[in-house]
């Protein structure tokens, strides 16, 4: 309805389709330190959707995450620094084939969670179902493309290169 220069818009509540409803709240009650999931017994922060699922337009609670503090942040940072170990840690020195296997295993497990991740994308950032599916699939494709690029880098680095009459085998190191 138009009233002078003021536009008044009326919104009608529309029920969320059942297959997209949040039926179970997520409670993330652990966090990662030194490669281990540590149980969190402190306070939690609620995670709300930008989408309302009530006629009163109340926020939709999706779940809770740990309200980690400074001490946990320092432990996580120290853990990451120790794991990298200035380029001499397990991951940076791992054989290419083992890294690739780890990433392929990860992405295969990730694909098994597609439906829940797609639903959470819809609720957390307001994407529609089709766009959320595309976002997930693009991420999976990107991981596979990165693996293929890494394989190419490894193959190329195994070759001798000639420059100014000098043959060299150039490899990456820590």
Describe every region a protein language model picked out.
Residues 2-65, 101-105, 137, 152-174:
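Terminal low-complexity tails and localization/encapsulation signals of metabolic enzymes
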């Amino acid at each position: 309805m138009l009233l002078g220069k003021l536009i008044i818009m009326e919104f009608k509540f529309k029920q969320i389709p059942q297959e997209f409803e949040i039926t179970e709240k997520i409670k993330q009650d652990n966090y990662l330190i030194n490669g281990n999931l540590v149980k969190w017994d402190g306070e939690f922060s609620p995670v709300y959707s930008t989408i309302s699922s009530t006629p009163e337009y109340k926020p939709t609670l999706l779940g809770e995450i740990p309200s980690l503090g400074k001490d946990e942040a320092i432990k996580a940072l120290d853990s990451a620094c120790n794991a990298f170990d200035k380029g001499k840690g397990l991951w940076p020195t791992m054989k290419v084939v083992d890294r690739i296997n780890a990433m392929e295993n990860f992405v295969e497990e990730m694909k098994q969670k597609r439906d829940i991740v797609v639903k959470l994308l819809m609720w957390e950032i307001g994407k529609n179902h089709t766009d959320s599916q595309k976002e997930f699939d693009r991420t999976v494709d990107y991981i596979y493309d990165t693996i293929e690029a890494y394989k190419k880098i490894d193959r190329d680095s195994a070759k001798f290169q000639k420059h100014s009459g000098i043959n060299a085998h150039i490899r990456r190191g820590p």
